[in-house]
Swiss-Prot record:
Protein's name in the database: Kynurenine 3-monooxygenase
Binding-site positions, L-kynurenine: 85, 99, 363, 398
Cofactors: FAD
InterPro entries in the cross-refs: FAD-bd (IPR002938), FAD/NAD-bd_sf (IPR036188), Kynurenine_monooxygenase (IPR027545)
Any one of the GO BP annotations: quinolinate biosynthetic process
Species assigned in the record: Sus scrofa (Pig)
UniProt family annotation: Belongs to the aromatic-ring hydroxylase family. KMO subfamily.
Residues binding FAD, per UniProt: 19, 37-40, 57, 111, 136, 172, 304, 317-318
Length: 471
């Protein structure tokens, strides 16, 4: 293609989702010319928005990124605080496990509404534009040239100073980087899928306590429910695919819920459950890791394109938003020099994003199984007690991840150390209690037996001395 056909822009953001639109705001604030290319239609105009609809849990890292572009208050006002997990046992008993102190909470946020607000925020910058219906065909990170297919169905080359790949877990930008030398990539589909259901309002109000993340843990699977602003709850059933495949009829589904989630059955409604369960098949969940996140000084990956997470720590969006914030901080540090900023971004974020990926996998086991354990709850209480007594020394993992900007990999290392300290202390304490109990229970008997042995030995010695027996 002739060079005269190439239109020069400064920054091309591929993907107009959450991370792409937030990144566009950060970069537009720096007076770059920013063009966002989104393959979907404008979700603000669409009658039905395609894509994922899992509710999001907005926490400190994400809020700090929104604060940096002046959107925190607007977004927070549209969320519902969740201060604890509400555990629903099989018997119907409910118990709360606080996330942190009374002032600490996460927010249940609508993915769709947040994306709409971020797109609107991008368009308020005169130097930023969102192009809908533009599919990325080719990416040449060596030169900063991308080929797009727009609504006119004519491929078009665009050159830019920087390509930001924010196009999700199945990133097209990343597929071009994978072909480059020394670019490592791995993906893992977990054996569990998810399905969304709804608990509607009852009598114009929430059907359950609204300020909780409700969990029905059942060891190998679980269901959760997050509150919505319209007083409904979005329920998500996470379960191995083979279990989904066993539920073939409405009767199977109703019997399954009656057995494992009996208190939710009347909340969802039998008729609605029987219909909604078969509306869409269970969806897969993928975990993606790659290294590095950049190529030369022309291309960088962020969000799910760099590190797709399973959703069990509620950090997918928050980690992606923190990517944007860290990149913005590095741009300050290196005075907008991409050749310095991009390598440092990879060096800084890869350990953190790999750590939160591993922690997200672990947290699924905790949510579906460990929360049923009295020992787990006992350990959580010990952690909270130690954190109260020594707030700067002992910090619970969830607090570090959700209510601070402690780097993810540092939080994981610190958590592992704290677990060793607590387990060692509990072992010695348990041993001391066992020895003390043994002494109290057997002490008199032990002393009596010792006295008998002493008298017997004295008798033997006496007879030996007078020559009546020989040993």
């Amino acid at each position: 293609m002739d060079s005269s056909d190439i239109q020069r822009t400064s920054i091309a953001v591929i993907g107009g989702g959450l991370v792409g639109s937030l990144n566009a705001c950060f970069l537009a604030k720096r007076n770059f010319q920013v063009d966002v290319y989104e393959s979907r239609e404008d979700i603000r105009m669409a009658e039905f928005a395609r894509g994922r609809s899992i509710n999001l849990a907005l926490s400190y890292r994400g809020r700090q990124a929104l604060k940096a572009i002046g959107l925190e208050d607007q977004i927070v006002s549209q969320g519902i605080p969740m201060r604890a997990r509400m555990i629903h046992s099989l018997s119907g008993k409910k118990s709360a496990i606080p996330y942190g102190t009374k002032s600490q909470y996460i927010l249940s946020i609508s993915r769709e509404n947040l994306n709409k607000d971020l797109l609107t925020a991008v368009e308020k910058y005169p130097n930023a534009k969102v192009h809908f219906g533009h599919q990325l065909l080719k990416c040449r990170p060596e030169t900063g040239v991308i080929t797009l297919l727009g609504p006119d169905k004519v491929p078009k080359d665009i050159a830019c100073d920087l390509i930001l790949g924010c196009d999700g877990a199945y990133s097209t930008v990343r597929t071009h980087l994978v072909k480059k030398p020394r670019f490592d990539y791995s993906q893992q589909y977990i054996p569990h899928g998810y399905m969304e259901l709804t608990i509607p309002p009852q009598n114009g109000d929430f059907a359950m306590e609204p300020n909780y993340l409700h969990i029905w843990p059942r060891d190998t699977f679980m269901m959760i429910a997050l509150p919505n602003m319209n007083k409904s709850f979005t329920c998500t059933l996470f379960m191995p695919f083979e279990e989904f495949e066993k539920l073939l009829t409405s009767r199977d589904v109703l019997d399954f819920f009656q057995k494992y989630f009996p208190d939710s059955l009347h909340l969802i409604g039998k008729e609605a459950l029987a219909q909604d369960f078969f509306r869409l098949p269970a969806q897969p969940m993928i975990s993606v890791k790659c290294s590095s996140f950049h190529f030369n000084s022309h291309c960088v990956l962020m969000g799910d394109a760099a590190h797709a997470l399973v959703p069990f720590f509620g950090q997918g969006m928050n980690a992606g938003f923190e990517d944007c914030l860290v990149f913005d901080e590095l741009m300050d540090k290196f005075n907008n020099d991409f050749s310095m900023c991009l390598p440092e971004f990879s060096k800084f974020r890869i350990p953190d994003d790999h750590a939160i990926s591993d922690l997200s996998m672990y947290n699924y086991i905790e949510m579906r199984s460990h929360v049923n354990s009295r020992w787990f709850i006992f350990q959580k209480n010990i952690e909270r007690c130690l954190h109260t007594l020594m707030p700067s020394t002992f910090i619970p993992l969830y607090t570090m991840v959700t209510f601070s900007r402690i780097r993810y990999h540092e939080a994981m290392l610190r958590w592992q150390w704290q677990k060793k300290v607590i387990n060692t202390a509990l072992f010695f304490f348990g041993t001391l209690v066992a020895l003390s109990t043994t002494y109290l229970l057997t002490g008199p008997t032990f002393r009596s037996s010792l006295g008998c042995l002493r008298r017997s030995w004295n008798s033997v010695t006496y007879f030996q001395n007078i020559g009546r027996i020989s040993l």
